């Protein structure tokens, strides 16, 4: 790597020198070489020790904290497109999954760049490059306005809230415009080994054998029939959060939105309408109970399962004003605690009973790691959640009841964080208490610094699968301006989820830029043009993982295929006669018998097996045809067969209508 010699040596502090390019644009800048150089401060009980080539930064208790140095008033504006390059060694005893470089400007705005070290070998000198450039920090405080021309200090920070020790030795820290960007996440490469394993898993767990047996009206096998196997809907749930106000009426302005929902998804979550403040009218006229009910009815009418989100979000800021007024009196006395419990019970009774039988799932409690004000003000603490689950079940006997939280998968590859452990322990405690907990919700909100590789996703899911509960991705999105990276990770994350046996559904947290809390994460732009991540979704869900084939029945009347599990329409045609049959392919496969209103041996198609058919056969003899003619000679569709072997016209008509109306695969997009 080339280092342009500086015309003048500029010393940021007395401890280390910074070299600056004589050109307009610097290509490399040394920030610290850590050779017998002290840190200027530590925080969070961190310690450091210096050496001739390294500075060890550590905390034997936990990973929250860091150490920093002053930079005076350093101008880094010429290095806006540079990346961090850090040389370090992970020491024995380290339990942290990452560290971050933090820069602060003269106004104390801060930007951070996080380095995922989960795959780093202990004791091995390692060089890592930041995934983003200096002008694109992945976190911080008002980082979008970080003033690179007035940088006052840098810090090396540990992993927030990780209870394990932090222990790294740092050799060099510099900025470079010439270094190649790193792989954005483990497994990004086109030839990454996990891809073959995912394909094998998907074939094993998401597909099944489908054997279609075609017979004539007498039950004899029919060869040469055309068998169209047309998938209509996945068994696996692919869905999105949706806006009730766009579904609840016939406003033409929402026609495209509704059309997309109907075509693209078989499961949906009302994003905001069932949240407690919205439900009781505190969020304005755009949220009504009647509108929420109408939206759920519309989704059900279009064969889309509905998730309820959420019943209790137990943080102060997410509660209605009536609950806030109670909590404002904290610490609560016994009567106030009783009032708090009564308010929660009334909330559960109201909303759970209103939607009983309409929802496939409920997020009963949302984000308990960060939201626990209600539990903190009750003597039973987190045990109160078990009572809430019991009360929801009493009001709704069918919905699967979920706990839901974020930053379980979006960890930058970390597989054993404090939050993951808390979530696992909370789920296990609820289950062991006998609470009717049925599912685990993984939200999945990602940015460029929190991308977790597919194999790490599997490792995390394997751990939670051991609890024996349903598992869903409940709120996936990836917000970034890099649309190609967004598409690549959407493809790979969705593939990893579909390839994991414990996963049942994949729900995004919005799909259209004009109806998304994080517009950059949407699949469709405001003008409904599709983005690369949307194309990745379509390619997987409606092409690579979609079964739509045309077969021909063999001499035994068999048309066999291995298809993706879900709903199908099977269309069998021979000699101008057609039968359409709905079918569902699921675990264990399916043996489907379809009788055509024809007679084997009726080679001229006139509904009778007679001498004329023998003459036709003589001109074009086929294997088994003579036996068919002999077996059915003298029979007639109209006079000699019971009508029970011929599909009723009404059934055929209904199946055809279903074919036209229910297909989820459409060229509209």
Report each predicted region and the residues it spans.
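Short, threonine-centered small-residue motifs that mark membrane-proximal processing/anchoring sites
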Residues: 6-18, 23-28, 596-609, 623, ...
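Extracellular glycan-recognition surfaces and repeat-rich motifs
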Residues: 30-61
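Extracellular ligand-binding interfaces
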Residues: 55-142, 150, 163-169, 174-176
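Short beta-strand-plus-loop segments that form exposed binding edges in beta-rich domains
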Residues: 155-163
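Beta-strand-rich domain onsets/edges
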Residues: 178-247, 276-283, 307, 326-332, ...
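Aromatic-rich peripheral "rim/lid" segments of glycoside hydrolase catalytic domains that contact
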Residues: 185-189, 340, 354, 363-382, ...
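Substrate-binding cleft and catalytic face of glycoside hydrolase catalytic domains
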Residues: 267-282, 290-409
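A cross-kingdom C-terminal cell-surface attachment/processing module
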Residues: 650-666
